[in-house]
Design a protein with these regions (language model features):
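NTP/phosphate- and nucleic-acid-binding module
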Residues: 1-372
Length: 372
């Protein structure tokens, strides 16, 4: 209602809460061709920031476009000199990226999950701070289908961490026993986070965990055990809407507002309570409700303008009426002052231009100020 009153048509989208955590996150976006956010939309009404957008997992297909078929063949190691990327693998094996399991090692900061029972989890130091137990530094390997990209905002939410980034150099070798380009799911020293896109893959290709080699005939349900399975893919145009299954389309937008619930996460941590009507202590709930004033003003100007300047809508204009006398003297001054007083008495916000300037200057300034 606030943005409607300001004359702006916004789109409410599902969004990520960021490091603060919480739930029920929604951003209020305004469509803009130069927007810095990508919105994934469906005709059924589903709307989400690409950082949060979910989609229905599609069926992995083979080179002919048919569903991949399970194999009983054992994993086979193949020498792959100078094959480092998914594109290199496509050329070398003569198949599509949908048959590859991409493995990426991530450095994770302040992971809030219990990794003690995960593969390699005991190698990471766990710290307790009050009621919060976490790992200041840990690593995970993300497995995702070769034609897809990892959504790091989703991954951070799944791991309950404050930050993460792709590991580099010696970190990768320490966790995967192989350099980047040859990381695989079967020789890891860290937990596996498997995207839903990998669950139904069959007879797949992957890194071997040994430099210069890859493996084929990989069956995810047979050959390794992930620590967690979840949605960590970046949704794309054409992906199936999670609500109705129809394809996504996208728009660019700018965030004007953001709301989300924090619950009792912080009030519990700070031991904050109040007494209810019966005198019993209750932990209060928190929420975040923000409007970007500068962004909102910029969006109003972008929406309401002409070739001479701003055309503010009535609800946001600095003044609703400009009284611009051509010559502020004698009878014209009396008439201007009377008009100003009458409008002010009626509750109209009025600007009286009483400057000793040429009419053209006054009218030009009125256009620049943006009177309705």
């Amino acid at each position: 209602r606030i943005f409607k009153r300001l004359g702006l048509k916004t789109i409410s989208v599902k969004a990520d809460t960021g490091n603060m955590g919480g739930s029920g996150s929604e951003e209020f976006m305004i469509e803009s061709p130069v927007g810095d956010d990508t919105l994934m939309l469906c005709e059924c009404g589903y709307a989400a920031n690409v950082e949060k957008a979910a989609c229905r997992p599609d069926v992995p297909t083979d080179d002919s476009g048919n569903p991949q078929v399970k194999t009983d063949l054992p994993v086979e190691e193949v020498a792959t000199p100078n094959v480092f990327s998914i594109e290199d693998m496509e050329k070398f094996f003569g198949t599509t990226s949908k048959r590859f399991i991409k493995a990426l090692i991530y450095r994770v900061i302040n992971c809030g999950l219990d990794l003690s029972k995960a593969n390699g989890g005991k190698n990471f130091k766990q710290v307790k701070d009050g009621n919060f137990t976490y790992y200041p530094l840990s690593y995970v390997c993300v497995l995702i289908r070769g034609d897809l990209e990892v959504n790091e905002a989703k991954l951070a939410g799944l791991l309950k961490c404050s930050d993460l980034c792709l590991a580099e150099g010696d970190e990768i070798i320490q966790m995967a026993n192989a350099p980047h380009g040859f990381v695989g799911p079967m020789t890891l020293n860290c937990p596996i986070i498997q995207d839903l896109s990998v669950v139904d893959m069959h007879d797949a290709f992957a890194g071997s965990g040994k430099e210069g080699f890859h493996i084929k005939h990989v069956e995810p349900s047979r050959d390794y055990t992930p620590f967690m399975v979840g949605d960590v893919r970046t949704a794309m145009v054409g992906d199936a809407c999670p609500d109705c299954g129809k394809p996504f389309y996208s728009k660019k937008g700018n965030e004007l507002g953001h709301i989300f619930k924090l619950g009792d996460k912080y009030t519990k941590a700070m031991n904050v309570t109040y007494l209810d009507q019966s005198g019993k202590p209750v932990v209060p709930l928190m929420g975040c409700y923000g409007i970007g004033v500068d962004r909102t003003l910029a969006s109003i100007i972008e929406t309401y303008h002409d070739d001479k300047g701003i055309m503010f809508p009535m609800s946001t204009a600095p003044y609703q009426v400009a009284v611009v006398p051509i010559n502020y003297k004698d009878k014209m001054k009396e008439a201007s002052d009377q008009l100003y007083e009458e409008l002010t008495t009626l509750g109209v916000e009025v600007l009286l231009d009483d400057r000793n300037e040429r009419p053209g200057v006054k009218f030009n300034d009125a256009d620049l100020i943006g009177f309705p």
